[in-house]
């Protein structure tokens, strides 16, 4: 947007002040740009574009960044923006969900700034499975957590608690390790 640069400066100043007060900062680094849809493909959750958004977040000193789990890659080349190298799509990443998420983690100083992925919208009967898969992908990629609001809180309490417990089980399980 026309005010993007001033918004980033304001947020960076707010984060500096929060840190002076001893507070942690968490930034939702979601993309919002109609140009990120090209030839019928939506790149709002592309690993390269979301990774760059995460990088902006850590540059302005977010302690944790929240990002959608990537579902594809190649956003920069598709929209014809940014300086890229073919190796970032061939040698440094694959289409595997863990590799795509790892690309996000690497844009946060190789995980020094924590990545939490969003749980996404509720789809009903597949929510438990989807949440566990997202948690496993995030943890195996080096991420630090998952926020699951709608999936957990738009259902009866016992089902929401079951979903949250399943997510916790992933992060507490020592057998689920970095890939």
Task: List PLM regions with ranges.
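Conserved anion-binding
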Residues: 8-90
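Short, small-residue-biased leader/transition segments that mark boundaries at the very start
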Residues: 2-5
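Catalytic-face loop-and-helix region of soluble metabolic enzyme cores
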Residues: 68-179
């Amino acid at each position: 947007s026309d005010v993007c640069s001033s918004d980033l400066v304001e947020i960076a100043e707010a984060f500096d002040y929060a840190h002076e007060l001893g507070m942690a900062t968490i930034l939702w680094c979601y993309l919002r740009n109609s140009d990120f849809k090209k030839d019928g493909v939506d790149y709002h959750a592309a690993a390269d574009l979301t990774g760059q958004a995460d990088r902006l977040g850590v540059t302005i000193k977010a302690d944790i960044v929240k990002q959608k789990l990537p579902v594809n890659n190649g956003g920069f080349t598709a929209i014809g923006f940014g300086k890229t190298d073919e190796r970032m799509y061939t040698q440094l990443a694959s289409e595997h969900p863990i590799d795509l998420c790892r690309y996000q983690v690497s844009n946060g100083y190789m995980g020094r700034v924590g990545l939490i992925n969003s749980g996404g919208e509720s789809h009903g009967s597949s929510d438990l499975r989807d949440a566990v898969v997202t948690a496993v992908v995030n943890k195996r990629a080096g991420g630090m957590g998952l926020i699951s609001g709608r999936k957990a809180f738009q259902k009866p309490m016992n089902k929401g608690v079951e979903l949250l417990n399943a997510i916790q089980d992933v992060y507490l399980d020592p057998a689920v390790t970095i890939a």
